[in-house]
Amino acid sequence: MNLVFGMIASIGELLIDLISVEEGDLKDVRLFEKHPGGAPANVAVGVSRLGVKSSLISKVGNDPFGEYLIEELSKENVDTRGIVKDEKKHTGIVFVQLKGASPSFLLYDDVAYFNMTLNDINWDIVEEAKIVNFGSVILARNPSRETVMKVIKKIKGSSLIAFDVNLRLDLWRGQEEEMIKVLEESIKLADIVKASEEEVLYLENQGVEVKGSMLTAITLGPKGCRLIKNETVVDVPSYNVNPLDTTGAGDAFMAALLVGILKLKGLDLLKLGKFANLVAALSTQKRGAWSTPRKDELLKYKEAREVLAP
C-alpha cells in the first residue's frame, strides 16, 4: 500500500469540552471554558495541522453546539462531509475536571454521536482513506458500536486501521464483560494500536493482549513512549516541559504517530517516537484538546523536519 500523500480519516465522537478554569472537584468549580473535543476529532485536527489531508466521520445535534463544532473543524481544514446532524439527539458535552496530574471527565451518553447508523457513513471518505482511526468511546453504546465495527471490518485489508484504547471505565459501568470483548475484537482488527501504560496493565490483567499487527504504541507519561514492531522494542524518552493542560496530549501523540507512519519511508521507530513525543509535549503548552502544534511551528525542530520536511 502506497501511503505517501494519502488521507487519514477518523471516526467517532465530536463534542464540546467544558474545561474547569480552576482546579478542584466539579461540584466546587464555578467557571468553565468551552472547547471543541472528542478524541477522533482531536486527532483529525492534529493530522490537518501537521500538513496531511484529514477527514472526520461523526454525528452532532442540529443545535448551536453542533454548528459551532462543524465551523471550527472547517477552520482547521478538516473535511466535514462525514459529519451528520441528528434531529433528535443533542450534541455531546463533556465536563473536564483539572485536578492533580491528569484530567478526569464527566460524560453523558444520550447524545448524537452514540446514534450513528450505517446510513450516516460517508463511504467516499472511508474508501479514500489510507488510514482509518477510531477509539473505544464510540463503541460504548449502540447503534454507534455496531456501525463503527461494521465499517472497520469492511475496510480491513484495504486501509490501515488505527485503534486508540482510550479507556473510559465509567462509560462501561455494568457492562464490563462486554467492554472486554469489544476492546479485544477492536485490538485484533487494528494494524496500529495506541494505549497508555495503565491501559495495557488493566487489559493484560483481563487476559487481553494489547498488540497491533503492524505497530503498538504505549504512552508512558513523563517517561515518553514505547514503540513495538514484531520483536523490536524501542523506548523513546519524553521532552521536558512544564505542562499547562494535558487534555489533548494523547490525541496529539496519536495524530503525530499516524502522520509519521504515512510520511516516513520505512517504519523508523526511533524517528517516529521522537516526533510523536515532541508533538505531544508541545501540545501541553496550550489549553484545550485542539492543542497540536502546527507544521510551521514544528519545522524548527530536527525531530519534526525528519518527518514533515519534503
Curated annotation (Swiss-Prot):
Keywords, A to Z, come to:
ATP-binding, Kinase, Nucleotide-binding, Transferase
- Keyword Cell wall biogenesis/degradation on this protein? no
A GO molecular function assigned to this protein is:
fructokinase activity
Name of the protein described by the UniProt record: Putative sugar kinase PH1459
Q: Which organism is it from?
A: Pyrococcus horikoshii (strain ATCC 700860 / DSM 12428 / JCM 9974 / NBRC 100139 / OT-3)
A Pfam short name: PfkB
| Keyword set includes Transferase | yes
Q: What are its GO biological-process terms?
A: fructose metabolic process
Extract the CDD domains matched here. bac_FRK
InterPro entries per record: Carboh/pur_kinase_PfkB_CS (IPR002173), PfkB_Carbo_kinase (IPR050306), PfkB_dom (IPR011611), Ribo/fructo_kinase (IPR002139), Ribokinase-like (IPR029056)
Cite the SUPFAM superfamilies for this sequence.
Ribokinase-like
What EC number(s) does its UniProt record assign?
2.7.1.-
Which residues are involved in binding ATP? 194, 219, 224
The entry assigns this protein to a family as follows:
Belongs to the carbohydrate kinase PfkB family.
